A protein has these predicted regions:
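Formylglycine-dependent sulfatase
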Residues: 1-291, 295-296, 305-331, 338-356
Length: 356
């Protein structure tokens, strides 16, 4: 059976839903198969002007950087059309920004070029591209207000991973762009997995905040809970709903089939740690397990979000419990298991043939 996806589930709840995906797709299956009525096809980073060589780190200028504004125009047209047809809709926009190449409007770049750096890792090109993205998203929010549908629309903003740790990317460095968080994209440290997460919509108190950890795979159960709490998918769903947190001023818990957030990097990556590793976060504790020698690190994120002080030997029971939960989960889902020679290059999973 095909897997659960947000658009497919929404159509099961209400067949009138119209679903669309614009921007970066980056997986091999056709968007239509996963439930999208309208889409840009199997687009990847190259459709966002990405070139995988040294030029990706050089600042460039464009009036439509990374297709930000053309994606916004397409999104606004879609929203307006569905509103005229009185159709409920689900729209996902996966921006090419702020992935390299580093492209922004020249005017925006000059604004940040002339600002004094507060950290050595500050980058005017990334800052400018991020502001251009913010402007593009603002166009869509303005359209929602113009159509008077904000009281019936949930908007979710997040990212898939933290920033590259350095520009250009390299393995060794003192502080990453994500400083004071440790490391960045490609690694399961906080700089790689802790990302912005903003939700607005009916019932959510303006400017409220929450310290409850959530993760991308919580989105599907949360959306189900918002649209029709009585609906139960036929297949198991990994995450849990954070609806109560949204509607309770950031307070509450997320109930998942297993206890903790799990991240798995089953390969070596020469421009990252170059060590296969996994991590689990439960309450305020985070355990990282390295797969080459089974080394364990434990951090209290409430006291040490920078992941500088390993407290595993001071807390052997907590370390053992988290390690057992982590390994049991990977076994239960038959996850890819690192073995010597598995790196981050695209290799057919049947060739790797190494699983828990």
């Amino acid at each position: 059976e095909n897997p659960n996806t947000i658009p497919k589930i929404l159509k099961k709840i209400n067949p009138n839903y119209v679903t669309a995906h614009f921007g970066k797709w980056h997986i091999d299956v056709d968007p239509k198969i996963l439930g999208y009525d309208i889409h840009d096809g199997k687009n990847g980073n190259k459709n966002g002007k990405f070139v995988n060589n040294k030029t990706q780190w050089i600042n460039e200028f464009s009036d439509n950087p990374k297709n930000i504004f053309s994606l916004s125009e397409k999104a606004m047209d879609f929203i307006e059309n569905q509103n005229e047809l009185e159709k409920p809709f689900y729209l996902q926009i996966s921006h090419y920004a702020i992935h390299t190449n580093i492209v922004s409007k020249e005017k925006t770049f000059k604004k940040y070029q002339n600002k004094q750096k507060s950290l050595p890792t500050d980058n005017p090109g990334l800052a400018a591209m991020n502001e251009d993205l913010d402007e593009g998203l603002g166009m869509i929010l303005d359209k929602i207000e113009e159509l008077n549908i904000s009281d019936n629309t949930y908007i979710i903003y997040t990212s898939d991973n933290g920033s590259v740790p350095t520009i250009p990317a390299r393995r060794f460095y003192k502080n990453s762009i994500n400083f004071p968080l440790s490391r960045g994209k490609w690694d399961a440290m906080e700089g790689g997995i802790r990302v912005p997460f903003i939700v607005s919509g009916p019932g959510i108190k303006k400017s409220s905040e929450s310290n409850v950890p959530v993760v991308g795979y919580d989105l599907l159960p949360t959306i189900i809970d918002l649209v029709n709490p009585k609906f139960t998918p036929k297949q198991d769903v990994d995450g849990g709903s954070f609806k109560d947190i949204l509607l309770s001023n950031g307070k509450g818990i997320v109930s998942r089939p297993y206890n903790g957030l799990i991240f798995h990097v089953p390969y070596e990556n020469k421009i990252a740690l170059n060590r296969a590793h996994s991590s689990i976060i439960r309450d305020n504790y985070k355990l990282i397990k390295y797969r080459d020698n089974n080394e364990i690190n434990l951090f209290d994120l409430n006291e040490d979000i920078f992941e500088k002080t390993d407290i595993s030997k001071l807390n052997p029971k907590i370390s053992s419990s988290l390690e057992t939960s982590l390994d049991n989960y990977l076994i239960n889902v038959n996850s890819l298991k690192w073995k010597k020679g598995i790196n981050w290059k695209n290799v057919d999973i049947n060739i790797i043939n190494s699983f828990y």
